[in-house]
């Protein structure tokens, strides 16, 4: 169980997040050095001029999972939670010992926003080639089987790739953050920055039971036909 985390923003520690075992609630304390800058990163939930050195306690509402509101948005979403649950089972961790801080530590530096959470669960980042087809097939099986999903020995490498590129992307449907070589189409983890000749994409996997990815593509094309400026997209599988 993670007891405390450093919260990092743009390379600077803005404060610490801790877990109160008795209250089963988290609390956040600003870094005094950060407070002196007067940068109001959460003016409604945790204003720097109104909080000072007082703890910002987590919210009781289920949606916040015992975290302060401005930190809860970094938690894994529905799809990320499915992958986190598989990771927990693989590592033989009791569900009763898991707190929201463990989930934030699992996200670490891979979140979609600017916040980073240290220490992070150790997973070596490598710019190895990813088999996007195997990734898509495993993602669909996990999504459809839900809590009954079990990872086969021959799927262990693909599962590690999926944990790396798939847990931080929000939303309900399976997706992953990848880097695609613009010359040969090679796919690598999108968590590795600065890869030359690679463009970065949020990949949304299809579903053989429901054409969610195809529907999103249709809406994309309708938007471009209507003259709306959209980011680049491509079909990779």
What are these regions (language model features)?
Residues 1-237:
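Phosphate/dinucleotide-binding and metal-coordinating scaffold of catalytic cores
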